[in-house]
A protein has these predicted regions:
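His/acidic/aromatic-lined binding-pocket segments of jelly-roll/cupin-type domains
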Residues: 77, 84-87, 122-123, 131
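A short, N-terminal "cap"/entry segment at the start of jelly-roll beta-barrel domains
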Residues: 20-80
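Short hydrophobic/aromatic-rich beta-strand segments that constitute the beta-sheet cores
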Residues: 67, 95-97, 149-151
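Bacterial N-terminal signal peptides
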Residues: 7-19
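N-terminal secretory signal peptides that target proteins for export/translocation
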Residues: 1-4
Length: 157
């Protein structure tokens, strides 16, 4: 009987004591600031006279954070089912967002491009700025020399 009581007390003590912390899953991928700088330099070297380069940086399954290197503006765009989140890494430019896309045409699944945006809002962009363009909102990047973004698409909920 004494052994049973001691075993019960020991079990209760074990249940009340905090156990070791459960291991947290590590990120699927990571990139240091030095690695990002090296990738941006490599992208610039590979581009030559090109005006746009895209390179995935980190990913977890289908979710990808990628570097976008712009030397010249592209066409205004709309991602009907995805928001676009980005951090300016280098360079400068402008973001025009909102308004109405003129002459919209689906150029590939998930991307509608047009000739211009009427009535959008303009915002200057520089290193450290963060943007979030909601799904379905027209947007366009003006480029001043170069604009390097770290961005990802976020599915519409």
């Amino acid at each position: 009987m004494v052994i049973a009581k001691l075993a019960g007390v020991a079990l209760a003590a074990l249940l009340l004591c905090p156990g070791p912390a459960m291991a947290q899953s590590a990120p699927a991928d990571a990139a240091s600031a030095a690695e990002i700088r090296a990738k941006v330099a490599a992208m610039a070297a590979r581009m030559g006279k090109g005006t746009f380069a895209y390179e995935p940086l980190v990913k977890d399954g289908e979710t990808i954070a990628a570097l976008e290197y712009w030397k010249a503006p592209g066409k205004p765009a709309v991602h009907p089912d995805e928001a676009e989140y980005a951090l300016v890494i280098e360079g400068a430019g402008t973001l025009v967002s909102g308004g109405t896309m003129v002459e919209p045409a689906e150029t590939r699944p998930g991307l509608v491009e047009g000739s211009r945006i009427d009535g959008g809002s303009t915002r200057r962009l520089g290193p450290g700025d963060v943007i979030l363009v909601p799904a379905g909102v027209p947007h366009w990047f003006g480029i001043e020399g170069k604009l390097v973004l770290l961005g990802m698409k976020l599915p519409r909920k």
